[in-house]
Amino acid sequence: MKKSTKLLAGIVTLASAMTLAACQSTNDNTSVITMKGDTISVSDFYNETKNTEISQRAMLNLVVSRVFEDQYGKKVSKKRTEEAYNKSAEQYGASFSAALAQSGLTTDTYKRQIRSAMLVEYAVKEAAKKELTDADYKKAYESYTPEMTTQVTTLDNEETAKAVLGEVKAEGADFAAIAKEKTTAADKKVDYKFDSGDTKLPADVIKAASGLKEGDISEVVSVLDPATYQNKFYIVKVTKKAEKASDWKKYKKRLKEIVLAEKTQNIDFQNKVIAKALDKANVKIKDQAFANILAQYANTDKKASKANTSKSDQKSSSDSSKDSQSSKSKSEK
């Protein structure tokens, strides 16, 4: 479930948000529970739960969901939402229903969650495009490594990985054959092509390959598997490496993809985009119990304002210094 909702990492699932929404759309005096001598109304339940952390986050989630649906709903088709949902269901297979239940989700609430994430993702990506500069391209180019042809073996424990490393580094060793035999990868795949901005392998593995020369073999690269929370160990050999062109513009399209990916994954940038959307929607908190749910986005605005003020102060200070030096020079003359 994490893949589809990473842009909303600080917000809980829509399941709780729907509960709050139901409370708000039902008469406050409607009885939820009846018993001898007493009843529990919607109002009782709302007042009892609204100050809890889960309700605070649920309300935030509901606000963000509504705002982005209003501002960007036409940009993401329902078909795309369904496709993303079906893809997730396929990945989980027979355990999908259990995974939903464990996350406190239903089919409908999970689809809403996916859609909210996709709407935020769209907005963040569009905002990132508007901020692209030649400086961004040049910075990305500096650390960019063009396509590499590699052979990679994956091991489940460090001791075995070190033993395999000794084998593949032995004189005359056939790396590909050993890698194929020893790898614990489910598909037994060892041949890969990627550049430094690719994501088909863990970032640390790609980084290790990027630093190798053609024909070189890496040391053992340890990577924490986010799915199992267990370390996996990789050894990579670069068999072919494209020569890097001196003009960054040759890779402009690819560099754009890399820069946009970095920006859209940046939490501060995401928060800035969400803050702007909330400001445009003129969100007003009527119940003081929820007064602080947008604080993280208000802080984003303050940070940006503070940064701009700092830059302005630095410029003013620099200009004042120049004026002072100029006046001193004229006085000396």
Curated annotation (Swiss-Prot):
Lipid attachment residues per UniProt (N-palmitoyl cysteine): 23
Species of provenance: Streptococcus equi subsp. equi (strain 4047)
Biased composition (Basic and acidic residues): 312-322
Record has Cell membrane as a keyword: yes
GO biological process terms held by the UniProt record: protein folding
UniProt subcellular location: Cell membrane
Descriptive protein name: Foldase protein PrsA
SUPFAM superfamilies with a match to the protein in the record: FKBP-like, Triger factor/SurA peptide-binding domain-like
Family to which the UniProt record says this protein belongs: Belongs to the PrsA family.
S-diacylglycerol cysteine lipid sites: 23
Function summary: Plays a major role in protein secretion by helping the post-translocational extracellular folding of several secreted proteins.
Biased composition, class Low complexity, residue ranges: 323-333
Topology of this chain in the membrane: Lipid-anchor
GO molecular function, one term: peptidyl-prolyl cis-trans isomerase activity
Residues of the signal peptide: 1-22
Any matching Pfam family: Rotamase_2
EC supergroup of this enzyme: isomerase
Catalytic activity: [protein]-peptidylproline (omega=180) = [protein]-peptidylproline (omega=0)
Residues covered by the PpiC domain: 145-240
Record-listed E.C. numbers: 5.2.1.8
The organism's place on the tree of life at top rank: Bacteria
Key words, A-Z: Cell membrane, Isomerase, Lipoprotein, Membrane, Palmitate, Rotamase, Signal
GO cellular component, one term: plasma membrane
Gene3D superfamilies: 3.10.50.40
Spans annotated as Disordered: 301-333
